[in-house]
């Protein structure tokens, strides 16, 4: 019975992911919300890349995805982890509308959209176990704009590219305040990493 449920859940996840990609392609024709134009490109460069964060998010109850764009990685996390409440912030109204529409289309009850920028002045109803961002800004800038939204034991999981650039960015962090771990992603052959940052 347990294996049957696992297969059922896996099939549902695959169906939702496929439907999400179809929504991107459909919306992208008129509004250009991502720089990919084929299902293969989106699956390889976006979906697989975003799925690489999942081993590090599955114990979180509340996640904030800053500058979510087309819902990457926020909607991928919400699809794979129905037990996790995922909030996506996106100040671009067109992209925020796409996320809101996709949440409704896919019937994702654990996902919601915050259609404004995350700033040090932003107040939310809850603190978050994880703050994540993908291709948004420098590490120090992301921390500055969102550290007040992290729970006491919370952490940043930032999706980054080349290791050289990451090393440059972490060198600017306060050593007595933050500790970090760099994880090489396994889902793609591209030079991608996940930067995990916690407060000491």
PLM-predicted stretches and their roles:
Residues 87, 162-200:
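Active-site capping/gating segments
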Residues 48-133:
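Conserved SAM/SAH cofactor-binding pocket of Class I
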Residues 143-153:
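A short glycine-rich, Lys/Arg-flanked "PGG" loop and its adjoining helix->strand segment in the class I
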Residues 95-97, 139, 166-167:
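Short alpha-helix immediately C-terminal to the canonical SAM-binding loop
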Residues 1-60, 94-111:
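Class I SAM-dependent transferase core
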């Amino acid at each position: 019975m347990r294996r049957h449920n696992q297969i059922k859940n896996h099939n549902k996840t695959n169906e939702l992911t496929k439907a999400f990609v179809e929504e991107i392609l459909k919306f992208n024709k008129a509004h250009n919300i991502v720089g990919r134009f084929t299902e293969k490109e989106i699956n390889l460069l976006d979906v697989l890349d975003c799925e690489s964060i999942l081993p590090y998010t599955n114990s979180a109850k509340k996640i904030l995805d800053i500058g979510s764009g087309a819902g990457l990685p926020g909607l991928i996390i919400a699809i794979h982890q129905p037990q996790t409440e995922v909030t996506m912030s996106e100040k671009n109204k067109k992209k925020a509308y796409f996320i809101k529409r996709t949440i409704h289309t896919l019937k994702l009850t654990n996902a919601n959209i915050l259609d404004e920028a995350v700033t040090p002045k932003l107040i939310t109803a809850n603190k978050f176990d994880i703050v994540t961002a993908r291709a948004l800004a420098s590490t120090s800038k992301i921390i500055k704009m969102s550290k007040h939204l992290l729970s006491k034991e919370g952490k940043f999981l930032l999706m980054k590219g080349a290791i050289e650039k990451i090393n440059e960015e972490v060198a600017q962090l306060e050593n007595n305040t933050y500790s970090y771990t760099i994880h090489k992603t396994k889902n793609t052959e591209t030079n991608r990493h996940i930067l995990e940052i916690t407060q000491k």
